Amino acid sequence: MKVNRETKRLYVGGLSQDISEADLQNQFSRFGEVSDVEIITRKDDQGNPQKVFAYINISVAEADLKKCMSVLNKTKWKGGTLQIQLAKESFLHRLAQEREAAKAKKEESTTGNANLLEKTGGVDFHMKAVPGTEVPGHKNWVVSKFGRVLPVLHLKNQHKRKIIKYDPSKYCHNLKKIGEDFSNTIPISSLTWELEGGNDPMSKKRRGEFSDFHGPPKKIIKVQKDESSTGSLAMSTRPRRVIERPPLTQQQAAQKRTCDSITPSKSSPVPVSDTQKLKNLPFKTSGLETAKKRNSISDDDTDSEDELRMMIAKEENLQRTTQPSINESESDPFEVVRDDFKSGVHKLHSLIGLGIKNRVSCHDSDDDIMRNDREYDSGDTDEIIAMKKNVAKVKNSTEFSQMEKSTKKTSFKNRENCELSDHCIKLQKRKSNVESALSHGLKSLNRKSPSHSSSSEDADSASELADSEGGEEYNAMMKNCLRVNLTLADLEQLAGSDLKVPNEDTKSDGPETTTQCKFDRGSKSPKTPTGLRRGRQCIRPAEIVASLLEGEENTCGKQKPKENNLKPKFQAFKGVGCLYEKESMKKSLKDSVASNNKDQNSMKHEDPSIISMEDGSPYVNGSLGEVTPCQHAKKANGPNYIQPQKRQTTFESQDRKAVSPSSSEKRSKNPISRPLEGKKSLSLSAKTHNIGFDKDSCHSTTKTEASQEERSDSSGLTSLKKSPKVSSKDTREIKTDFSLSISNSSDVSAKDKHAEDNEKRLAALEARQKAKEVQKKLVHNALANLDGHPEDKPTHIIFGSDSECETEETSTQEQSHPGEEWVKESMGKTSGKLFDSSDDDESDSEDDSNRFKIKPQFEGRAGQKLMDLQSHFGTDDRFRMDSRFLETDSEEEQEEVNEKKTAEEEELAEEKKKALNVVQSVLQINLSNSTNRGSVAAKKFKDIIHYDPTKQDHATYERKRDDKPKESKAKRKKKREEAEKLPEVSKEMYYNIAMDLKEIFQTTKYTSEKEEGTPWNEDCGKEKPEEIQDPAALTSDAEQPSGFTFSFFDSDTKDIKEETYRVETVKPGKIVWQEDPRLQDSSSEEEDVTEETDHRNSSPGEASLLEKETTRFFFFSKNDERLQGSDLFWRGVGSNMSRNSWEARTTNLRMDCRKKHKDAKRKMKPK
């Protein structure tokens, strides 16, 4: 038997809670070997056990299993009925079996495959041999890693037509053997919802990580070399793109250089050294003009606002940190060196301090261009880096940050002009072929001093502009200044002697600026503090920057002409400058120099307020733009172009708070944003003239000129103090010049940069507010007459509207002095209360007489209440209490009226009351409708009266409770039973009553009638006493009905027999035990009548006996006379027979039912 045993899993249900595993094991062990018992208890939400069952693994034979189930199934055990079944197989057990079966199947298949290979003579795909061993007997089959046998393949190369031989044994070292056991179960706890994946873009997108959007990369256009080439720096065309190809040709360097010079704003704001990495590229000015022409269009197409925003943000971070020592080796890729290739460390660090990294491509002409470690191989790289770092430590970071800010400001102005002049210079250079590294550096210097304003912001643009500056443009610019013609030898001498200029160059990034600064110093040194510095050499970077700043302030007049010429060039963000031919450029430069001279003279006598007002005009970008086609091109943009110009002017004159909403908004972000946006806004059509553009710009700025005057007066910048030197001949030219001077002065006050930025933001907000208020004023004036209500009492709340008085005041302020006062006023308006209404204005406009007039709503007692209520709200005009809030006559006032009755009225009322009392006593009538007016008035209901429980007078409104406790049902039932009890009648009483029945009946009749008339409340009260007072009368009435009919009118007893219905007893009150005459049986009425006549003559003893017999209760008693006629409704003679037949039938039915039940039981028994 044991051999046939199988392991079965049984389900045992219906267990009680106190059954243990041991109990189950003992119970089932007699049928087989119990290997495992598992008891499971299901509980409800409260933890109470609901169902208990068990699984038992038992090794048992089939016969024993049947026996076990037949014996134990449906049996009761410890309070539960067992239910035994074969349980479903455990899924773990089934899984193990499936795996074993799969494993066995797999083994069979492998053996089958091996046999098949042997039969067919195929290759054994698993051989133990060194990878690369050829399979004997099979050509081009080799053993690879893990003993796999793979064929040698001949594959076509993807990029070439050549077919290569692929030996798998030589490319198999990255193969991994994958384990066969895939059944490693991962616990649920280690599962995750995260999608694992690499860093490829699809995996990142699946995880929800999206990279920042980057515009398409700059296109680099190849330009053919020109015969003459000067060093041009290849700048990274975009902030995030680093040029990583050292073997770039000179052409490519030049074209990169030109790309950046055209779009200087892109690279300029990026302080990160990576963006400015310049590889070892030789300096060349290869076909610059053609490169510019191409790039001006192509680069502009790929430019995006996102890039601009990125660059602006980076430049802002740079301004905040102003840490020049960060990545010095990379951040200053260019070093200015002398002929002996010794680095001018001070220059490097002036660059570093300004945060101008590789952007300063324009190096001092005095010093040779000292290339960065990566850019220049002739210098010792380690030495250069060391020198840079040492100087960085020496310099004062604070000074540099200030200078950086100031130079950034000026850079915007010079960008446009420098760009144009740069372009011309490039053309000139190509003709002259006299470009060398030194001369290139000097020209960059010359250009820098006018573009000194563009130094920090245009640092990168300067580096881009460093490519080439032509002598012709330089001569044209210097025509109006103290003219100094410099040869290369002179420039070399200057590089050795005057180190200040190189520093200026490095700062300003405009190559032309530095030479011009020198000339400016020579010519106008008496004006400016630069004269102080000129005498000695500036070695330390801080000194260099300071001297540069001072020189720039005083020489602003000279610089501005250049700046005006240069600005179009910088401004040509979209390559506008490249659209024109060389000849037109040169002519325009000459004319612009002449007009610049006029600007200088006019500036000396110009009034600062006029200048500040005019700064908003478009000429900030280039006052001489009339002659310059580049400027015309810029101005052709129309109103769009006004914004950049305004931006620059406002930035230059920091006093001004608002030029136009658009410009001020853009300005508030960062100075860099202005030139960038200005460049972006340039259109490529270049035929519009300055006159038309001036009109537009002046129109746009007219709104804010007055406010600009005020702010320029209050700003207190040194530039404004110096500006009175300028004359107001040409307002447009003055604007640019004055903006330069302001930017120079802003260098002096660089520490207040953040405060000024905030002021600019406020100015932008003010401009917007002003525009809104102008609209509001128009709407207000248009709608002023539509409001019919008087001004002193508005019927509706006006949200956020300003009254006419306020608008008039603001308009007068705007006209007279719209400065800080206007700002404060507008701020006050914007921060006003939510419910500002014209009440505020009317309160100011009210006369004192109206203000102190006695208001009728505050008179009297109700007025006093209203006054107290008003005092809670204070002077808040939103909660003014007027006559609408007065209460109507209150209860107290009514009482006062009652108190004011005259004595005569009171006496009259008393007399009336007495007369009424007399009438009531005589007639015994309760007159409830008294004519007392006071009581009527007091009882009259008024909606306005509010019940106040604290007031004694209000007690009249309270409903008084009945003092009598409500009787419970039990008490009422008890009373009813007591009333039903038959009273004990004494013979004396009966005797007395029998003597005078008529009197008794009369009294009962009277009382019954009276009781009928009395209300229910009184009736209840009189119920008990009457019972007690006259029990004999009641019983006698019950006993001898006396023949009178129950009615409200006197009825004689004579009518007894005529009346069909009569009442035996008179109801005294509502006596419960009295029977209802209607319930009496009609069949017994005649008997009663006869009985009555007999009873009247009977003796008292008989009467008592009869009374006991005839007392009737509501329920029937045995032998009740009322049931005598019921026999008629019963079955007659055959009733006994029917009963017997019914009983016989029922017994038969019972017998049949029992028989069927027994038969069914017998059938159900198992055979």
Curated annotation (Swiss-Prot):
Keywords carried by this UniProt record: Coiled coil, Isopeptide bond, Nucleus, Phosphoprotein, RNA-binding, rRNA processing, Ubl conjugation
Residues recorded as bearing Phosphotyrosine in the entry: 376
Keyword Repressor: no
Gene3D superfamilies, per the entry: 3.30.70.330
Positions with biased composition (Polar residues): 248-275, 640-652, 738-748
Post-translational modification: Phosphorylated.
Glycyl lysine isopeptide (Lys-Gly) (interchain with G-Cter in SUMO2) crosslink residues: 225, 314, 1057
SMART domains: RRM (SM00360)
Keyword Nucleus: yes
Region described as Disordered: 223-304, 435-470, 499-533, 590-908, 932-982, 1006-1026, 1071-1105, 1145-1167
Sites bearing Phosphothreonine, chain numbering: 302, 381, 795, 888
One GO CC term, this protein: nucleolus
InterPro entries: NOP8_RRM (IPR034138), Nucleotide-bd_a/b_plait_sf (IPR012677), RBD_domain_sf (IPR035979), RRM_dom (IPR000504)
Biased composition (Acidic residues): 457-470, 837-847
Comp. bias regions, Basic and acidic residues: 501-510, 653-668, 727-736, 749-776, 817-827, 874-887, 940-968, 1007-1026
Entry-linked Pfam families: RRM_1
Biased composition annotated in UniProt, kind: Basic residues: 1153-1167
Residue numbers bearing the Phosphoserine modification: 268, 298, 304, 331, 365, 378, 432, 723, 801, 837-838, 843, 845, 890, 1036, 1082-1084, 1099
Coiled coil: 753-779, 886-924
Residue ranges of domain RRM in the record: 8-89
Compartment(s): Nucleus, Nucleolus
Subunit structure as annotated in this protein's UniProt entry: Interacts with the GTP form of RRAGA, RRAGC and RRAGD. Interacts with NIP7. Interacts with DDX18; the interaction is RNA-dependent. Interacts with DDX47; the interaction is RNA-dependent.
UniProt-listed PANTHER family: NUCLEOLAR PROTEIN 8
The protein, known as: Nucleolar protein 8
